[in-house]
A protein has these predicted regions:
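P-loop NTP-binding module
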Residues: 1-226
């Protein structure tokens, strides 16, 4: 996206960015969890592109790889992964593990070494300290988390943040998996900001890869194309 800002994909993320700004105009969303019902649905790519899009509006953005089982962000941004979120969680919540990237205003905190107890670390009081610390440093923090059908990590973090953005992929995510993920978020009292449908218009032959819609807890859906 950063290398082709005029592409349909870039435009889709700009629309997603705008939609998120209108989710709660009186109380701006400052911490977002991205997840998906299952693996292979593109949640890490969506997290990275959304972070880039937000940074392009002169916001200070931190992208955190909170997938402590199968980390991806260090690969997407070609960064070392010797230290990262796990370093904050097991050592010092205030140490500097942010890495600058080519996008002005955006920094990335990679996962760091994969720990034996990811869920316990993410559910700890130290994670709350890390969240508060990062919130003071950035206008918005995006947390890339594991798929919801695999482990509970996304649910744990979703209940601690301002909202969750769920990513599904057309032709991959089953209706049952999507409903199950939504129920998990509802049970944990996580706020659902919306759903990004990956590959939607691309498969329909229109050249854009993403479609965004928001639904409320009342089950009423208001669709807006990106």
């Amino acid at each position: 996206m950063y290398h082709d800002p005029r592409s349909p994909v870039s435009e889709a993320f700009r629309t997603l960015r705008t939609n998120l700004e209108f989710v709660s105009p009186g109380a701006p969303v400052k911490s977002i969890v991205t997840s998906s019902p299952g693996p292979g649905e593109g949640k890490s790519t969506v997290a990275a592109n959304l972070a880039i899009s937000l940074a392009q509006t002169n916001k200070r953005v931190i992208l955190v790889d909170a997938d402590l089982r199968k980390s991806t962000q260090h690969k997407l941004f070609s960064l070392p992964n010797r230290v990262g979120l796990t370093s904050l969680l097991v050592k010092d919540a205030n140490q500097d593990v942010e890495q600058e990237v080519a996008v002005p205003g955006l920094s990335v905190i990679t996962s760091g070494p994969i720990p034996p107890n990811p869920s316990e670390l993410l559910a700890s009081d130290v994670m709350d300290t890390v969240r508060d610390y990062l919130a003071q440093k950035a206008d918005i923090v995006i947390y890339d988390t594991p798929p919801m059908a695999v482990v509970t990590d996304a649910i744990i973090l979703g209940s601690r943040m301002d909202g969750t953005l769920m990513v599904v992929r057309l032709g991959v995510t089953s209706k049952e998996a999507g409903k199950r993920a939504k129920e998990l978020l509802k049970t944990s009292r996580s706020r659902v900001l919306g759903v990004v449908v990956n590959d939607a218009t691309h498969r329909a032959g229109y050249g854009s890869y993403y479609y965004y819609y928001y639904y409320s807890d009342s089950e009423n859906e208001n669709d807006s194309a990106s």
